[in-house]
């Protein structure tokens, strides 16, 4: 997380989750290397946000790389440590605007990554104006 905007967003998200039993682990890259803390409770994890993770992996190496496989393998490792993994992502390709090449690369990679994550998921729910629309499986 870089810059004041990112730090404010993190603080806002932490405040929203205060007192709700969440343990926040900041991991801007390499989620495959994350080992979740042991607990006696059923384990649920929230990965927020796939779009930010992808950008962090793509643009922090000094050049643009496609991090899709690294992220998918990381998601599989994280899912193996939990009973339920919830992933927050964003639809980044629906505005129809042509952006500079680097941004278009990101949009294409995110579109493919979202498709791959949806294929792995038991349930896919899109929220439109706060209204959940289940696209795959059953919302529980």
Residues covered by each model-derived region:
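Short coil-to-beta-strand
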Residues: 42-51, 83-87
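Short, surface-exposed linear patches
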Residues: 15-20, 46-48, 67-69, 108-111
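Short, basic/glycine-rich phosphate-binding loops at helix/coil junctions
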Residues: 11-15, 45-59, 93
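Short amphipathic alpha-helices and their capping/turn segments at secondary-structure boundaries
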Residues: 28-42, 70-83
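Conserved P-loop
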Residues: 1-39
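Structured helix-beta-strand junction loops
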Residues: 19-20, 41, 81, 120
């Amino acid at each position: 997380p870089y810059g004041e905007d990112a730090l404010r967003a993190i603080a806002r998200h932490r405040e929203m989750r205060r007192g709700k039993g969440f343990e926040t682990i900041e991991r801007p890259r390499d989620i495959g290397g994350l080992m979740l803390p042991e607990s006696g409770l059923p384990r649920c994890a929230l990965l927020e946000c796939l779009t930010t993770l992808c950008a962090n992996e793509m643009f922090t190496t000094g050049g643009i790389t496609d991090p899709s496989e690294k992220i998918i393998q990381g998601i599989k490792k994280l899912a193996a440590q939990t009973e339920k993994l919830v992933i927050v992502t964003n639809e980044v390709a629906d505005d129809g605007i042509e952006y500079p090449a680097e941004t278009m690369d990101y949009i294409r990679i995110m579109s493919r990554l979202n498709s791959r994550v949806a294929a792995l998921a038991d349930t896919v729910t899109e929220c439109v104006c706060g209204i959940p629309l289940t696209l795959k499986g059953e919302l529980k």
